[in-house]
């Protein structure tokens, strides 16, 4: 399986990488939170742009991105607008969503974008090609905050992302039972062993799914999300605790 290198970070080798999400509503808070995050032990900074209030002003969005880049120049920056239908803060048209991601790519300020699988096949393929032409990596994602589908469906979605040339396929699912967590882990392992030719990220959410956020190195998930202050999804644990557990499992 090939790895993905962003800046000096090799994703898909060694312990799972820690991603933290910054969810500030305005430029002032972007700046203050970035300064606080800078003191934290993590690997990738995800900017959750759907929390940013002045979204219609592309210049304002990119000014905030510039602050993040300048505050943490060594950290890979993942630009994510999470749509309302997949658990995000704001609804957005497909056209505006694609335009926003293209603006981020054009800015030269971001290393990676998050692109939702179910945006529309043609739009997804075109945006992946556009990102790659500008040396920006793509995390292709799918989130279900209500249920966990069968393992076959989980694998099918991850394989579809791979077929669309995502650099890193990602899926996050809500368990209704502990067996749903096992379904996610089994699907992750099967994908990683039989189909994946690149790193994947998977997680089962809420308290029930916490084990999936810790056991990525065992089952085949290359990264996990930790909380600096407020969790961006149910079940996230603090980055310090997360690093401790990932290190223990890596060194065992």
Curated annotation (Swiss-Prot):
One of its GO terms (biological process) is chorismate biosynthetic process. Involved in the third step of the chorismate pathway, which leads to the biosynthesis of aromatic amino acids. Catalyzes the cis-dehydration of 3-dehydroquinate (DHQ) and introduces the first double bond of the aromatic ring to yield 3-dehydroshikimate. GO terms for molecular function: 3-dehydroquinate dehydratase activity. Homodimer. It catalyses: 3-dehydroquinate = 3-dehydroshikimate + H2O. Keywords: Amino-acid biosynthesis, Aromatic amino acid biosynthesis, Lyase, Schiff base. PANTHER family: 3-DEHYDROQUINATE DEHYDRATASE (PTHR43699:SF1). This is 3-dehydroquinate dehydratase. PROSITE patterns: DEHYDROQUINASE_I. The active site is at 143 (proton donor/acceptor), 170 (schiff-base intermediate with substrate). Belongs to the type-I 3-dehydroquinase family. Pfam families: DHquinase_I. Its EC number is 4.2.1.10. It is an enzyme of class 4 (lyase). CDD domains: DHQase_I. Coiled coil: none annotated. Pathway: Metabolic intermediate biosynthesis; chorismate biosynthesis; chorismate from D-erythrose 4-phosphate and phosphoenolpyruvate: step 3/7. 3-dehydroquinate binds at residues 21, 46-48, 82, 213, 232, 236.
């Amino acid at each position: 399986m090939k790895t993905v290198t962003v800046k000096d970070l090799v994703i898909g080798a060694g312990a799972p990488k820690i991603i933290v999400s910054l969810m500030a509503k305005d430029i002032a808070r972007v700046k203050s939170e970035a300064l606080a995050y800078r003191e934290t032990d993590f690997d990738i900074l995800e900017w959750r742009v759907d929390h940013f209030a002045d979204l219609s002003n592309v210049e304002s969005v990119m000014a905030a991105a510039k602050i993040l880049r300048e505050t943490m120049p060594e950290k890979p920056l993942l630009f994510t607008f999470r749509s309302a239908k997949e658990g995000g803060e704001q609804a957005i048209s497909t056209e505006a969503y694609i335009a926003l991601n293209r603006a981020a790519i054009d800015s030269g300020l971001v290393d990676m974008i998050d692109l939702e699988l179910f945006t529309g096949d043609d739009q997804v393929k075109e945006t992946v090609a556009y990102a790659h032409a500008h040396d920006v990596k793509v995390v292709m994602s799918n989130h279900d905050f209500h249920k966990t589908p069968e393992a076959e469906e989980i694998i099918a979605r991850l394989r579809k992302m791979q077929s669309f040339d995502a650099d890193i396929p990602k899926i996050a699912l809500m368990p209704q039972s502990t067996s749903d967590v096992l379904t996610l882990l089994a699907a992750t392992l099967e994908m990683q062993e039989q189909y994946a030719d690149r790193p994947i990220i998977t997680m089962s959410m809420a308290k029930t799914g916490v084990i999936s956020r810790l056991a990525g190195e065992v089952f085949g998930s290359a990264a996990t999300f930790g909380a600096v202050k407020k969790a961006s999804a149910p079940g996230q644990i603090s980055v310090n605790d997360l690093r401790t557990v990932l290190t223990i499992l890596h060194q065992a």
